[in-house]
Amino acid sequence: MVLSDSLASDTRFDAVLIGAGIMSSTLAVLLHELDPEMRILIVERLEAPALESSSALNNAGTGHAANCEFNYTPCHPDGSINIQKALVINSAFERSLEFWASMTELGKLSPKTFLNLVPHISFVNCEEDVLFLQQRYKKLSAINAFRDMEWSADKEELSEWIPLIMNNRNPDQKVAATRVKRGTDINFGALTLAYLETLQESGAVELKLSTEVVDISRLQEETWEISLANTAGTYCVQAPFLFLGAGGGALSLLQNSGIEEGKKYGGFPVSGQWLVCNDSKLVKMHHAKVYGKSAIGAPPMSVPHLDTRWIGTERFLLFGPFAGFNTKFLKNGSNWDFLRSIQFSNFAPMIQTGLRNFDLIKYLIGQLKLDHDDRIAVLKDFFPEARSSNWTLSLAGQRVQIIKKTSKGGVLKLGTEVVTSSDGSLAALLGASPGASTAISIMLEVLQRCWGKKMSTDIWQKRLRDLLPSFGQDINHDKSLLDKLRNRSDSLLGLR
């Protein structure tokens, strides 16, 4: 892999990927594994890869497998619980584990550098939510993918699972939790760097750092021309395929491309903040990702959780994220990002979405009013003995929620969405959670929609099955296949 901020020695590539985070690096590795001769350029506006949403402290949630996140199992007005999204996300995460296991088997990844085993726990502390969690547990644990989920409303047992949360809690309070021991914490910044490292010796992948995309245009000969600028000057590169994987910045790039498919989208930026524990004794006492229920109107990346994370070899304890609002689409973006994204084609849908999501607006206003004492008060609902002096505020990454024009007007879309041009020459990834944890499945969708002919060839099919032994099969409805897949992944990734 060539790292450079000089002018390009070559101007023609098979694929240009904008953004050097987990999404672009995942796609680059997949393309290189499928076709080692493919020439790929990755362009990053910052001075190093994975400094935006892929960074460990910027990511709103890591290791998403729908084990503990309530927003993936919504409760309908009639009281029934929909687990379909949880099944989709869980199988997508298994696909990611499967790929990392294969790369580990090939000697191209070392899981200890980015992956740790951490229990995933859902916790509730009122009678109504206890009943909901019990229903959720019964429905999920009846499914093979979640059969190892544990339930407890026993306070002594819960004190063993989550001592910080149970210590000095009101004895009259109704509490309950579910636990999945086979949970993970993933440092996607470290994984991004590991992916890029695997490409180092190929000579087919070039990484341009501190390089800004100035313009995107379509040439007559079915080629994209991307104008780039850095300290060395301005220049153009060309490629038949362009991927916009620049996190919150992808929307602006998509609009700049001019493709018809991009005109129906807008974006609503949501910022985030963590409380980070500075007491090493407390950090060592908590070993879990513990999710609670979100407030009404809260965006999905703002579900409160007390979160064990590793950054390098250091263990951290975070609480949050608390949501906020500013007009940037990236943490290192411009305050003009939001206003510049408003166009004639998306103006009405954005107004309609705002009117239909007053709870979200109200929630964000409330979050903006919080001071440090207010945030500690929220933390105490999780951790009753929390002291203000043990926690400091840290700015998390920026997210852009999708606003999409539909036949019913503007709709706020949760999750991620792949947008492709009609000819498959351009793909953009919009949205947020669960994002990184399901990157392999998302990039397989990009390949299917943009490289369909090659995806159907015997060579690519064989290579995909080598990398993903369960490729093309439904692991949600095949118990023996899922068991075999998990045994292989756990063995290779050290998850036992």
From Swiss-Prot:
GO terms for molecular function: 2-hydroxyglutarate dehydrogenase activity; L-malate dehydrogenase (quinone) activity. InterPro entries: FAD/NAD-bd_sf, MQO. Signal peptide: none annotated. It is an enzyme of class 1 (oxidoreductase). Its EC number is 1.1.5.4. SUPFAM superfamilies: FAD/NAD(P)-binding domain (SSF51905). It catalyses: (S)-malate + a quinone = a quinol + oxaloacetate. GO terms for biological process: tricarboxylic acid cycle. Keywords: FAD, Flavoprotein, Oxidoreductase, Tricarboxylic acid cycle. Pathway: Carbohydrate metabolism; tricarboxylic acid cycle; oxaloacetate from (S)-malate (quinone route): step 1/1. Its cofactor is FAD. Belongs to the MQO family. HAMAP family: MQO (MF_00212). This is Probable malate:quinone oxidoreductase. It comes from Prochlorococcus marinus (strain SARG / CCMP1375 / SS120). The lineage of its organism: Bacteria, Bacillati, Cyanobacteriota, Cyanophyceae, Synechococcales. The gene is mqo.
